[in-house]
Amino acid sequence: MLPLLRAIWQADAAFPSGAFAFSYGIEGALALRPDMSLGEFERLCAAVLQQRWASYDRIALQRAFRAGRDLDALAAVDREIEASTMIEALRAGSRRNGASFLAAHARLGQPLALKLRAQVKAGDCLGHIAVMQGAIWAALQLDEQHAALCSAYTVASGLITAAVRLGAVGALQGQSVLQALLPLIDALVATPLDDDAELESFIPILDIAAARHVHAELRLFAN
Amino acid sequence: MLHALRQAKAQATATVAARVGIGGPVGSGKTALIEALIPVLQRRGVDFAVVTNDLVTKEDAERLRRSGLIDPDRVSAVEAGACPHTVIREDPTLNIAAGDELEARFPGVELILFESGGDNLASTFSLDLVDWWIFVIDVAGGDDIPRKRGPGLLRCDLLVVNKIDLAPHVGVDLDRMLADARQVRGGKPVIATNLKAGTGVEAVADAISAAVLFRI
Ligand SMILES: Nc1nc2c(ncn2[C@@H]2O[C@H](COP(=O)(O)OP(=O)(O)O)[C@@H](O)[C@H]2O)c(=O)[nH]1
Ligand SMILES: [Mg+2]
């Protein structure tokens, strides 16, 4: 049961990792579509999971998880994310979230987190969140599938928390969306991943919204 | 051997800046306090940087950067995700990382000031993030504020009561407000300031120096 408990620990929103400040583009999307219905919001969350998480974050997460303590391999996945994320706001957000996540684990004394933090400091590694999660969760001995569940769940619950805080959906409406997304997360994680899968992400409304968000006068979330 | 150890320890501590939080309600004068402290700290030769936690984009960071008082690169902005409480208390990791990043960029930095985005009297700083923290209230908020015993006001290391120039205009009995504040804080320090005129700023700088820079 310990691997499962560790995954619950890492998926818990109470674990301080900076994730609460990132809206995964939702803030920008809601600014473009302020009258979004709950159904549309749910479809948007599903699209994030299918078209960004499953084809992008998950691949980076798994590669990092398998790279384990190999710092060069981790840096390579990290560079690939940097090169393939077109939108600067998402790139910078992913690095900042990664830095916060590392700061938490470094403060907890996790040896790999201390090494990775030094690498980021020295500029040898950029520290994208999916890569840091994969590496640290492997070091913390989570099970690989649990790590994927944990990653997808934190993205879904992060989207919902952001929408609740922006006043776009109610706290319980948000939980009904999250509940409806659980089978999708389960199915996505159950689908095996090719070793040579390429990182791909394209969600027009979120990409456009995130790109516009950088210039927004009034914004609460970092992306 | 002992000498080498001491030297290593001195080096290790030399790279770690003291971290000081500045919290308090929106509009109480947190940014104004930083603006007033900047020239005083500079005159005292303190090597410092600032992290702001704006609720809305980077307003305070931009205000400090444009002030011409400080090298704009020494001001970092953390967006608080609509949660000014969370970013200094439940999840201070964004701020911790921003502080680490400033330390890496400015190796000699001795002091990092963290300005909270500001919210109500309940906000407190996590001691994971800061070594010592200030809470700023202002007289225009009313002289009953100390008696409301908010955790921010009670637990901070230094309470600053700002805008004392406004006391006569808002019908506040300043002496009584300060006495109440000292009483509910059990004698922990309280400093009255008028940041428009610079009153009390040296005393705040003295308190910071004594508490975390070990200079008197
Ligand atoms: N009269 C007076 N106004 C002040 C004083 N300190 C700050 N202010 C004004 O109060 C407003 C809010 O100050 P600011 O520093 O932005 O507050 P913050 O939200 O706590 O950072 C600004 O318009 C300041 O000029 C003071 O001591 N006296
Ligand atoms: Mg301010």
From Swiss-Prot, chain B:
Per UniProt, what is one GO molecular function of this protein?
A: GTP binding
Q: What single Pfam family name could you report for this chain, choosing any that match?
A: cobW
Which InterPro entries would you find in this protein's record? CobW/HypB/UreG_nucleotide-bd (IPR003495), P-loop_NTPase (IPR027417), UreG (IPR004400)
Q: What does the UniProt keyword field contain?
A: Chaperone, Cytoplasm, GTP-binding, Nickel insertion, Nucleotide-binding
Q: Which domain of life is it from?
A: Bacteria
Q: What is its main location?
A: cytoplasm
What does the entry list as the binding residues for GTP?
A: G24, P25, V26, G27, S28, G29, K30, T31
Entry's Gene Ontology cellular component terms: cytoplasm
The biological process GO terms on file are: urea catabolic process
Location of this chain's protein in the cell: Cytoplasm
Q: What does this protein's UniProt record list under function? A: Facilitates the functional incorporation of the urease nickel metallocenter. This process requires GTP hydrolysis, probably effectuated by UreG.
Q: Which family does it belong to?
A: Belongs to the SIMIBI class G3E GTPase family. UreG subfamily.
Outline the subunit composition: Homodimer. UreD, UreF and UreG form a complex that acts as a GTP-hydrolysis-dependent molecular chaperone, activating the urease apoprotein by helping to assemble the nickel containing metallocenter of UreC. The UreE protein probably delivers the nickel.
Annotated protein name in UniProt: Urease accessory protein UreG 1
| Gene name for this UniProt entry | ureG1
